[in-house]
């Protein structure tokens, strides 16, 4: 049974959303939001985003959203003290991440990562992209320091990292 306790009800919401890749009826991993996924030797994953795909606010979903997550969030010790998601590690090694163009990104490991695509298709999918256009005003590397300090105070946050965390929670964000 997938849902046993009241707190497991969150899985209903999670499975109700599209993800980058998902399982088809034969339980094969196939593109969902992505237009295409190229996998080479189980170690190089190239994602091609659908043209015209947008975030819920209508802003384009682009490679910048992946770059922002990888460089400015996942590897930022203030936002992710434990570092990038464990599913991104192969024998302790992080992937090389590349933006190939506005709609194409690539992750490359020196060894195969058999857990990467299944993690993206899971009930609580691996996070690899965030809406950069929306979150940059809450990130210390992008926001005007005075404006950010005012937002931290106005929202009664401990610091900019807590404020960023509140706004990056897609299940709890109010705007």
Please provide the spans of the model-predicted regions.
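Extended, Lys/Arg-enriched charged tracts that mediate electrostatic binding to polyanionic substrates
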Residues: 175
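Hydrophobic/proline-rich hinge and linker segments of small-molecule sensing/allosteric domains
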Residues: 20-22, 46, 129
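Extracytoplasmic
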Residues: 15, 32-34, 40-44, 61, ...
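Aromatic- and charge-enriched surface segment that lines or borders ligand/interaction sites
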Residues: 36-80, 106-111, 116
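N-terminal lobe/hinge region of extracytoplasmic solute-binding protein
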Residues: 1-41, 71
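Surface-exposed binding/hinge segments that line
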Residues: 38, 85-171
């Amino acid at each position: 049974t997938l849902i046993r306790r009241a707190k497991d009800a969150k899985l209903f919401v999670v499975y109700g959303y599209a993800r980058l890749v998902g399982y088809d009826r034969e339980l094969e991993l196939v593109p969902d939001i992505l237009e295409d996924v190229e996998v080479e030797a189980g170690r190089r994953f190239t994602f091609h985003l659908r043209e015209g795909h947008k975030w819920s606010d209508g802003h384009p979903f682009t490679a910048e959203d992946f770059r922002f997550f990888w460089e400015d969030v996942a590897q930022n010790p203030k936002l992710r003290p434990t570092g990038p998601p464990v599913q991104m590690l192969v024998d302790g090694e992080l992937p090389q991440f590349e933006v190939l163009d506005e709609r194409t990104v690539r992750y490359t490991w020196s060894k195969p990562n058999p857990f990467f695509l299944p993690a993206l298709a899971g009930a609580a999918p691996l996070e690899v992209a965030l809406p950069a256009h929306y979150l940059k005003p809450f990130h210390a590397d992008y926001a005007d320091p005075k404006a950010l300090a005012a937002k931290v105070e106005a929202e009664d946050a401990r610091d900019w990292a807590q404020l960023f965390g509140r706004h990056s929670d897609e299940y709890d964000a109010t705007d």
